């Protein structure tokens, strides 16, 4: 079957779902960025956006997020989940804009859910307080996670699971992004989900390093 036929069928049935976006980053790349950044290591790329995050206003973020939502609507997308940075660099500007954009999304009949992005980690007390504040206020629909942003992925995930359980939220975790057999974050995430009793409420995002492992290891992780 032609995959585009399948896609068209889903759109006619009500639309498709974009379960992983970063709308606060939409329309922020420049041609110079593409020339200077494209070959940098992933961790370096996480810091490239800091300049924009410091200088952008809430209005800038709102404009970009709503433009991205409009674009998704044009592609026949029914629901979107976007990670939004919440950290001492961007402060509350991006999350405030995303909250405002929920009204825009509702007016245009497209679902919009927010996940926090822990780009500066969660072990930092300031970062943790900022994220928990917005969880307490009901601004975050899904607890987002980036274990590699912290010195201890184990401690990072323990905090993430405690927050998710406290506020009864699903978890979406960026894991194993480097296509490197030294990474075993997907396995760690699965073990933490079982340890915390949060099975069925956790999504592993990327997990491309699994493909760099031997078949027997991959099958062990698949079976967890």
Give the ranges of each region predicted by the language model:
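Generic hydrophobic alpha-helical membrane-span motif
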Residues: 26, 81-82, 180
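Residue-level marker of motif borders
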Residues: 13-15, 71, 169
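Short, flexible, glycine/charge-rich loop motifs used to bind or transfer phosphoryl groups or to couple energy/partner
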Residues: 6-7, 12, 132-133, 193-194
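Active-site gating loops and adjacent loop-to-helix segments of metal-dependent hydrolytic enzymes
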Residues: 26-61, 134, 139, 167, ...
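Active-site loop-helix segments enriched in His/Asp/Glu that coordinate
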Residues: 33, 51-140, 149-162
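Hydrophobic faces of well-ordered beta-strands that scaffold small-molecule active sites
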Residues: 15-21, 80-82, 110-117, 141-145, ...
């Amino acid at each position: 079957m032609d995959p585009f036929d399948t896609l068209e069928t889903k759109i006619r049935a009500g639309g498709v779902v974009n379960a992983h976006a970063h709308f606060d980053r939409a329309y922020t790349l420049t041609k110079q960025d593409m020339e200077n950044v494209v070959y940098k290591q992933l961790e370096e790329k996480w810091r490239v956006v800091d300049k924009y995050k410091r200088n952008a206003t809430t209005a800038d973020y709102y404009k970009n997020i709503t433009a991205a939502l409009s674009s998704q609507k044009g592609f026949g997308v029914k629901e979107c989940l976007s990670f939004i940075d919440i950290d001492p660099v961007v402060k509350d500007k991006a999350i405030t804009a995303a909250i405002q954009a929920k009204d825009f999304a509702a007016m245009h009949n497209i679902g919009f859910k927010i996940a926090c992005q822990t780009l500066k980690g969660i072990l930092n007390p300031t970062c943790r307080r900022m994220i928990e504040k917005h969880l307490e206020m009901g601004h975050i629909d899904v607890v987002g996670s980036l274990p590699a942003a912290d010195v201890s992925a184990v401690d990072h995930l323990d905090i993430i699971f405690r927050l998710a359980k406290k506020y009864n939220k699903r978890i979406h975790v960026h894991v194993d992004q480097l296509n490197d057999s030294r990474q075993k974050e997907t396995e760690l995430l699965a073990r933490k989900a079982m340890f915390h009793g949060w099975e069925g409420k956790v999504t592993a995002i990327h997990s491309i390093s699994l493909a760099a492992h031997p078949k027997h290891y991959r099958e062990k992780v698949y079976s967890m």
